[in-house]
């Protein structure tokens, strides 16, 4: 029979071993958490990510910051086609130029197509979202889960509506209509000068009001219904965000777009994203109804692929 001393020695040894295992496990999780994550923004001060080369559209580089500068110059001289009422004619099917920032609107070393992407943020100049400290911590928690409203087939709010894939645009006097190929969402944008609705009414797209400033369509979005994610990885804005979108044609087949977001609850200052649309060249293209609802397998497969490649992400 073992003595009381030997039994206590054994228990102490087991306890010490358990503590060592827990410490090592916690350390490994910490190390993993600090490792480069495919879709996560590199820490401030990191060297530029190694990514696949960008293309070119309408004589402008596809890379967001370069496209932004080039498009600003082209917008000064390009004369767009006109609708019968004299407004720039944006009608037709449009695709986003590049999909590299669907995962993360900031710079990231990898995307689902393997190319990676430079930041689509052109102001501030460092390409970083100017989060308040608490909001940055919440964003980091989203990163660990690859949190995206798309897995629930929730409608894209402003500003993400314009950042997605195919759009169909129709114009009439006093209105611009936009149909999204994702989740059958759409926009009805009055351009007749009417005021915004009351602040107590909240909408998925926000309350939209458009106006023409020369050749540029300016859309103000207020009254967001809920907190909205901006990309697959979980950057976000609050329902009180104010969004200003500016769409300018720089070529008969290219529209240059900027989105400025102001949200005093989440950010330390307003910030701006730049990107573009290119005209769909297929004259027979049709936008089909998308089967999209919470739990639909096609959406789960897409977001699960992102989770598999993100540290800390949960599995289905």
Locations of the language-model features?
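PEST-like low-complexity, intrinsically disordered acidic/proline/serine-rich tracts
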Residues: 9, 13-14, 24-316
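N-terminal secretory signal peptides that target proteins for export/translocation
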Residues: 1-11
